[in-house]
């Protein structure tokens, strides 16, 4: 059975952030705390989005009045999955179990050689 790299995105709310950079750091740290120690192999990063006007890449963070919505990316290797769909289900289950109120969406599943 093949191995897969599954990429998920999540919407993370950060309250009382002083800046966009602060919100990104807090979101990654909070997500890391929820995943550790069981899933410390999951890579966490702030996602990117494209500017609707010029198409240049921007960090996926929106901040108003000290509250930020941060788009996080989780990368997880899933071993011995039956199919890409099965790998996505496993990753979503394992991460979602530790973050029950965080919306997760699969954005990519790639087979690892």
UniProtKB/Swiss-Prot annotation:
Source organism superkingdom: Archaea
Signal peptide stretch: none
Matching InterPro entries: UPF0212
Please state which protein family the record places this protein in.
Belongs to the UPF0212 family.
- The entry's protein name is UPF0212 protein AF_0282
Which species does the entry assign this protein to? Archaeoglobus fulgidus (strain ATCC 49558 / DSM 4304 / JCM 9628 / NBRC 100126 / VC-16)
What taxonomic classification does the UniProt entry list for its organism?
Answer: Archaea, Methanobacteriati, Methanobacteriota, Archaeoglobi, Archaeoglobales
């Amino acid at each position: 059975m093949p191995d897969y790299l599954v990429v998920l995105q999540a919407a993370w709310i950060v309250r009382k952030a002083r800046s966009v950079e602060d919100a990104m750091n807090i979101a990654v740290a909070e997500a890391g705390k929820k995943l550790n120690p069981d899933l410390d192999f999951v890579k966490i990063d702030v996602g990117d989005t494209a500017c609707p006007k010029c198409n240049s890449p921007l960090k996926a963070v929106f901040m108003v009045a000290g509250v930020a919505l941060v788009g996080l990316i989780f990368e997880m290797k899933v071993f011995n999955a039956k199919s890409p769909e099965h790998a996505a289900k496993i990753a979503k289950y394992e991460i979602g179990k530790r973050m029950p109120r965080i919306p997760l969406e699969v954005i990519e599943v790639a087979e690892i050689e």
